[in-house]
Amino acid sequence: MTVTPSFIEYVLVDLFAGDPAITARPMFGAVGLYFEGKIFGIISADQVYFKADKSNIRSFVSRGSEQFSYMKNGIEHRLPYWLLPAEILENPHLLMKWAKKSSMIELNSN
């Protein structure tokens, strides 16, 4: 799950144009992405994942996205984060729109 510093810089500077509303912080071997202090995504293994729920999951699934998962003690754990499609990464307007939408999602801690 390593994340290279150059990839974090690419995400923050190149993809989000250095927008000060977008920040990144290390978390559990990955990096959390925040919009105005609210987590909306993660970077893991130099891949970008955005938070999803019933309000936006179809946008990810219809584009062939995969859900973030990791193995712990031989058990696969899935988190409500989905791989960001390349077409969204390459479109600054859509990227910010998706980031804002994902930042509004409140996850239940069951």
Tell where the protein language model's regions lie, with residue ranges.
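Charge-dense, helix-prone N-terminal extensions
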Residues: 1-110
